[in-house]
């Protein structure tokens, strides 16, 4: 068998940007750094991410590389850092058998471990129409979530996170749910740290929490959604979802990075799951936070949307975790931008939200949002009912364009919250 020389094979990998076919190619943009010319880094990445390996092999003919190999269509930068853009043959990856899991194993796999690349970050990922059509996306999305919460106006959803994170028994959960729901919020959820410890079994927690919510609704007339955390091994997700729903849950929650794309997709697409899915991003920063290495959070969020997240966490504007405004806006765009038939995912802000910063959060992030507070509700000096009321008072002030300090003059719960619920760091 005659082999094509390396130079000819490498030359075959370059195409002009106008040759990229949106109906045929999956395109990816990477930031790269390394001790080599940009084109050399692009070539090695394209080879590793498609047909090639560390040496030429007999059956990797020129025809194979031309037909199935990754193509380089744009390289920018110099002095060992910049951006490379590659077009992958979508036919290499079946969107349903293998799907996102297989795709990322190739185009966002070994590239992170290559010696020639000191740093690499996947910044953008775009799909042909037929690939997107294979993903059903959220069942509820933004408007469906509002409807499920009984909200008939275009406003953010405000909710609470049960605190302390762990350590409460089911009866106490129910008591806290009742107290919080009395304050008029729309939503409450488990902390990501709890699923079903022996002192607070999931089914008991759901039963007691929903009983507390129902008791509050008898007084307020207001529906409240409760997202119960069912994060578990993938083959047990549907079983746990069924147990939660049978116990009365009107919402589910999962930790996206740890159940994976396939776990979320299987849960969201199952016809037995007729409630929204709240997706926490806990753990995402392990691969998204570095500006130079990993996967951009907007790419990850886009994939979570495709796989069926009805709501997805994006961090908070003035909170306790890392925040970058440009990154956050890029992330929100990934959840809202038109994507064929796929519904919008509702962005969820949490981690340091409180009555005093809700106004700036609404102004920065918009109305099609969910804002959650844990300590910002339960840390209120007068208790969780007052904390929930203060959050709703802050929301109404923000929507009316009234400064929170002014609104506090007419709302005692808000007035009590402002001097005490502040972040020291």
Protein language model features and the residues they cover:
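N-terminal capping/small domains of soluble enzymes
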Residues: 1-182
């Amino acid at each position: 068998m005659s082999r094509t020389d390396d130079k000819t094979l490498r030359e075959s990998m370059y195409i002009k940007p106008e040759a990229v076919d949106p109906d045929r190619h999956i395109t990816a943009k990477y930031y790269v750094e390394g001790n080599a010319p940009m084109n050399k880094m692009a070539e090695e990445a394209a080879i590793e991410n498609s047909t090639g390996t560390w040496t030429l092999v007999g059956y990797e003919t020129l025809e194979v590389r031309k037909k199935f190999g990754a193509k380089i269509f744009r390289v920018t930068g110099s002095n060992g850092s910049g951006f490379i853009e590659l077009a992958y043959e979508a036919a290499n990856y079946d969107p349903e058998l293998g799907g996102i899991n297989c795709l990322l194993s190739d185009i966002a796999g070994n590239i992170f471990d290559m010696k020639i690349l000191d740093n690499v970050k996947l910044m953008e990922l775009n799909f042909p129409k037929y690939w997107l059509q294979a993903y059903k996306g959220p069942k509820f999305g933004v408007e469906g979530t509002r409807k499920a919460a009984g909200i008939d106006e275009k406003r953010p959803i405000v909710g609470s996170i049960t605190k302390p994170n762990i350590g409460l028994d089911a009866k106490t959960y129910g008591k806290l749910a009742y107290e919080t729901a009395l304050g008029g919020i729309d939503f409450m959820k488990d902390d990501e740290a709890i699923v079903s410890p022996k002192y607070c079994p999931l089914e008991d927690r759901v039963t007691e929490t929903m009983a507390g919510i129902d008791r509050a609704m008898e007084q307020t007339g207001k529906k409240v959604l409760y997202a119960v955390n069912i994060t578990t091994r993938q083959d047990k997700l549907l079983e746990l979802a069924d147990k939660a729903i049978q116990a009365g849950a009107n919402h589910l929650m999962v930790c996206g990075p740890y159940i994976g794309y396939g776990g979320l997709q299987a849960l969201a697409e199952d016809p037995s799951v007729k409630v929204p899915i709240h997706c926490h991003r806990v753990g995402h920063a392990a691969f998204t936070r570095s500006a130079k290495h990993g996967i951009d959070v907007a790419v990850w969020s886009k994939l979570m949307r495709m796989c069926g997240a009805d709501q997805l966490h994006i961090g908070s504007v003035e909170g306790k975790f890392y925040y970058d405004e440009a990154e956050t806006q890029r992330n929100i765009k990934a959840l809202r931008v038109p994507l064929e038939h796929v519904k919008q995912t509702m962005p969820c802000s949490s981690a340091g939200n409180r009555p005093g910063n809700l106004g700036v959060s609404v102004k920065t992030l918009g109305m099609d949002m969910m804002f959650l507070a844990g300590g910002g509700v339960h840390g209120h000096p007068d208790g969780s009912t007052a904390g929930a009321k203060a959050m709703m008072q802050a929301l109404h002030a923000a929507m009316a364009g009234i400064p929170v300090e002014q609104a506090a003059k007419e709302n005692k719960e808000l007035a009590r919250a402002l001097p005490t619920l502040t972040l020291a760091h």
